[in-house]
């Protein structure tokens, strides 16, 4: 098993409902360690940059509007197979398809307001972590 890092974000729908602690606890209970964390209210421009990979998708404008509508909590998580573990704990993107006990099954309001985001691959994790954090902000 490899120790790796991944990017995790608690989205505005969850921060507005004061779920940051409950979600972080679920991640930590799964064996993931928070090695960096900050609360950020994204500008529209930051949201567009972060989600640039989706710029040609029909949901892009709505996504950027939502992500800049309130605070997010962005984190770097570390642990054995952290990327896969984080995705397992988050659950399927659509909460209707998420397994019982996952973050999205428990907390998501809809497919759009699904409470969390997490990197899907090592390359994505590296890009997303670098987008928000400097090396000196990550303390393992």
Curated annotation (Swiss-Prot):
Q: Tell me any Pfam family this protein matches.
A: NDK
One CC-aspect GO term: cytoplasm
Q: Which residues form the active site?
A: 117
What EC number(s) would the UniProt record show?
A: 2.7.4.6
Role description: Major role in the synthesis of nucleoside triphosphates other than ATP. The ATP gamma phosphate is transferred to the NDP beta phosphate via a ping-pong mechanism, using a phosphorylated active-site intermediate.
Q: Which HAMAP family match?
A: NDP_kinase
Q: Can you name this protein?
A: Nucleoside diphosphate kinase
Q: Which organism is it from?
A: Chelativorans sp. (strain BNC1)
